[in-house]
Amino acid sequence: MSVEDPIKNGHFAKKQFCSRSGLISWSHHRRFEVGLSLAQQFAGKRVLDYGCGDGSFLALLMQSRAHPTAAVGVEIEPQVVADCGARFSTQEGLTFMLEGELKKPQHRGAFDAVICMEVLEHMVEIEPLLENFARLLGSSGKLLISVPIETGPPLLMKQAARRFAGWRGIGDYPGTSSYSMGELAASLFASSKRQHIIRPIHTSAEGGQFHDHKGFNWMMLREMLCRKFYLEETKASPVAWLSPFLASQVWFLLRKNTGEVSA
């Protein structure tokens, strides 16, 4: 996967794809490759990316052979939306809007697919957002979710990598909380049955509340998703054939629930 202008000028692309750390760069390239592979089925569809960041994923998707007919990137900050709109102004079919615009009635059932990458782990309240996704999706619409693995052996590897990256002055991890030995032990043996440690809540400069990665339990999220959507496929990244219990991120491909019982 090549990263070209104006993609590489995006804020996240600069610190992820173009990171001085080979491990960070490789991991994010592979994460996007897995996601783009899953999103190929959205060819000719209308797609929304909730929490699109700098727009890199949508731009790459629109440049692929199996690209959507139209793609809409959504963010909460006006300056981010303006930056994305300016950098991708020549990309046909790609637009960006503020999150508040999704409340307009014309967006109900307007999308064949909703993508949400590395967002849900930061949400203090996830259920209302899932309800909104269901409202935005048309009949049998698809939901593509990716979240980080912050439990089990991957957590130990990530914490070591974060410390090393911080020591080298690479990347920025605002709001990243440290773990006590007891919290690490609980995180190693976390399950889908209960929240294993208390998650810290931070407040942004704008007054919004959010979680960092500490204590995020992807297994509990999977259970929550399966109560509202039908789970079609689970994939790991950066290595797609790995079990999520040994991976850095996990992808869920789901379908809007029309009465089926999710496995």
Where in the sequence are the language-model features?
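Short, intrinsically disordered terminal tails adjacent to the first/last structured region
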Residues: 262-263
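S-adenosyl-L-methionine-dependent methyltransferase catalytic module, highlighting the catalytic core
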Residues: 3-30, 79, 100-103, 124-138, ...
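Conserved SAM-binding loop
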Residues: 32-155, 250-259
